[in-house]
A protein has these predicted regions:
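N-terminal regions immediately upstream of nucleotidyltransferase
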Residues: 1-74, 92
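Detector for Asparagine
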Residues: 16, 42, 106-108, 150
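Residue-identity detector for glycine
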Residues: 35, 43, 52, 82-87, ...
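Flexible, active-site-adjacent loop/turn segments at secondary-structure boundaries
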Residues: 47, 82, 87-93, 145, ...
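Conserved catalytic core of two-metal-ion nucleotidyltransferases
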Residues: 54-62, 68, 108-166
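Catalytic metal-binding acidic patch
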Residues: 77-112, 120-122
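Short, intrinsically disordered, charge-balanced linker/junction segments flanking boundaries
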Residues: 171-176
Length: 176
């Protein structure tokens, strides 16, 4: 898939036309899935498909993020967690995302996040998500080993690198 071309076509879209955005992005999701299926049928090994799916999804989410969050007025980081955080994305797997906030979201951020998640669902991506501040990550990690493990395997997709680094530091095994 030609991601620079997709980004340009998305930027050229009428920002008020959800149908046009959904059509473009849904076609990209189908192209990615069909391409990976075809590679597998032609003898490509499973690991290449699983890691390739994650990398292609990373690129797609990055484009959607840059498109959807142009008017963002808060510091956030979009983070892959779970198997997706490890860079593994099996067919039909959920795409587990954590949206890390520097502070509680304001109404603008809340609206943008809602639009972002709705768009991901509308284009056929199965999204599992959480929205947390660093303090909430620390609290949840202390209470729930699955959250701690997810955060240990987390990787930054897009957004504020310093915020991500602070979260990783405060939720490291030495601090939990």
């Amino acid at each position: 898939i030609d991601f620079p071309s997709l980004k340009k076509r998305l930027d050229d879209c009428d920002h008020n036309s959800c149908a046009e955005q959904i059509k473009l992005l849904k076609a990209a999701v189908i192209t990615i899935a069909d391409g990976l299926k075809e590679r597998y049928r032609n003898g490509c090994d499973v690991d290449t498909v699983v890691y390739g799916r994650a990398k292609l999804t990373d690129q797609l989410i990055d484009i959607i993020y840059s498109y959807q969050f142009k008017d963002l007025d808060q510091v956030i980081a979009l983070i892959a967690v779970g198997g997706y955080g490890r860079g593994e994305l099996h067919p039909k797997s959920d795409i587990d995302l954590m949206i890390l906030l520097q502070e509680e979201e304001n109404q603008n951020t809340k609206d943008l996040l809602e639009k972002f998640l709705m768009l991901l669902w509308d284009i056929g991506l199965e999204i599992g998500h959480s929205v947390r501040t660093i303090e909430e990550c620390v609290d949840e990690s202390t209470r729930d080993i699955t959250v701690a493990t997810n955060i240990m395997e987390a990787r930054l997709l897009v957004g504020d690198e310093k915020l991500f680094a602070q979260m990783k530091e405060k939720t490291s095994p030495e601090h939990i």
